[in-house]
Amino acid sequence: MKQYLTFTEEVRHALENNLPVVALETTIISHGMPYPQNIEMAKEVEQIIRDNGAVPATIGIMDGKIKIGLTDSELEEFATNKNVAKVSRRDFAYILASGKIGATTVAATMIAAEMAGIHMFATGGIGGVHREGEITWDVSADLTELAQTDVAVVCAGAKSILDIGRTLEYLETQGVPVVGYRTDEFPSFFARKSGFGVDMRIDTPEEVGKMMNTKWDLGLKGGMIIANPVPESDALNHEEIEAVIQKALAEAKENNIAGKQVTPFMLDKVKKLTEGKSLATNIALVKHNAEVAAKIAVAYQKEANQGK
């Protein structure tokens, strides 16, 4: 397995010395945002993690290798190359074996992070059960990954375009703890509210770090969700975004958009219908998640190092 992994010097040094590391995905760069906002966001997020005492490890697949940490030129490649594949668990081996370039989703980033020994990951929002999922069976592989891979994910909830109620039901079935970070309500990506509660509320990085260590010390496989609402000043109104999503969903149906095309299509439509406000919110919530993830990574690593 190790023959597939390559590390930047910064990440290698951190892992060898038991320093806190935060994994980052590349799908948000290649498929989630337009250029140049995507590359600007990627670099800013990495710096936010450094400023909060941890080391960023942006993950992607290139030239038959799983890159744990990317150089500036590699980041640029993910931001501008139109042939970047979107990689989840099922595509992982194929993209790696064929030498193609692949951006990692939440699921694929978790797989690579665990291989590298990284247990903290910051993203925008997780995938989940799509609306009308009971008819289409369109359920993101992110959810099954969270059930089996030991990586905690800081996110602003599930993407608003999903069926949040069913997503939470599925996570409960899979035994994935959903922690509200300083919130009692599960956030819905662009909005702070969703109408659904979290399993438990935790207000400090230290308590989250302790829970992570305890979970894995017990041999309880799988990750956990740390739901961190978008800052109030950047949030969109829950009812307004819901109306926009209903409109975008109708268009997706008319155009027979399905499978892994749904999320990029919907995010693009929502961006147009909100006149770009959703993109600004998306960038703000990713930065906020990176800050919280770095603080928790520091607390988790301190706790883990004491137990060694």
Curated annotation (Swiss-Prot):
Binding site for Mn(2+): 138
Domain of life the protein comes from: Bacteria
The gene coding this protein: psuG
Gene3D superfamilies named in the record: Indigoidine synthase domain
Species the sequence originates in: Brevibacillus brevis (strain 47 / JCM 6285 / NBRC 100599)
Lineage of the organism: Bacteria, Bacillati, Bacillota, Bacilli, Bacillales
EC number: 4.2.1.70
Pfam assignment, any one: Indigoidine_A
Residues bound to substrate: 86, 106, 140-142
The protein, known as: Pseudouridine-5'-phosphate glycosidase
Protein purpose: Catalyzes the reversible cleavage of pseudouridine 5'-phosphate (PsiMP) to ribose 5-phosphate and uracil. Functions biologically in the cleavage direction, as part of a pseudouridine degradation pathway.
GO molecular function: hydrolase activity, acting on glycosyl bonds; metal ion binding; pseudouridylate synthase activity
